[in-house]
Amino acid sequence: MGIQPSPVLLASLGVGLFTLFGLALGTYLVRRSRRPQVTLQDPDEKYLLRLLDKTTVSHNTRRFRFALPTAHHILGLPVGKHVYLSARIDGSQVIRPYTPVTSDEDQGYVDLVIKVYLKGVHPKFSEGGKMSQYLDSLKIGDVVEFRGPSGLLSYAGKGNFNIQPNKKSPPELRVAKKLGMIAGGTGITPMLQLIRAILKVPEDPTQCFLLFANQTEKDIILREDLEELQAQYPIRFKLWFTLDYPPEDWTYSKGFVTADMIQEHLPAPAEDVLLLLCGPPPMVQLACHPNLDKLGYSQKMRFTY
């Protein structure tokens, strides 16, 4: 006859197993509760976010901070994507795309840096920017409709870009060791989003090269952020500026983006090179693309936001 375990031993084992199960379940629930919740659950839904703060960045640029549903929420925006803001303005529905300057490491809020185009300032746009003026008029506590994630490009890390040729096409993988960027004005925000995402990962070998065009020195938004990143990562990130109307002591380039600027400050055409463009249409269409054609950059090597 074999040895039978005593009822006391069986009871002890049962209590021990139950305790272990309870500890495991408790640990799981705690970790789950600490995991941040995502705000942008559905790209077709609109999410009402409340204005928390509005600060002046420069003479015509503001930083708008919006509250997420709770202090433990993140926006949930993949790197490379943007959001749409929509509002009823003067009887019409106005929708504009924006790339936040915060990331999913920031919980409880999202920041947008936006240039405000006022009425009567630019002769070609006498009415100014409808959405930017609307946002500038908001009071703390007002709400705005957000929708996203949106966009044809997303960054998967270590030089891997998923790019859709159009909205209906599946994404195609593009691998780049060198990332060249040409930005104009507020077109810097998607570039900064990518640069930060790449540089914060020591194992990401992607090199970043940025050519940033503006009209005047005071128009350069997020300059301190960019120069701080350049100083911190001098090998991985190269930064260059050009101004239409530079001051006398300006040490960077002058004028529109040229072929010489591209040759000198961006990576040469190659299979492992990707160029990203974001800025005013005249700059992109009249200054950038013709010069990229001239220098031998294929369409596959470019992406325009």
UniProtKB/Swiss-Prot annotation:
CDD domains: cyt_b5_reduct_like. It comes from the Eukaryota. It is found in: Membrane. PROSITE patterns: FAD_FR (PS51384). It holds the Pfam family FAD_binding_6. It is an enzyme of class 1 (oxidoreductase). Belongs to the flavoprotein pyridine nucleotide cytochrome reductase family. This is NADH-cytochrome b5 reductase 1. It comes from Rattus norvegicus (Rat).
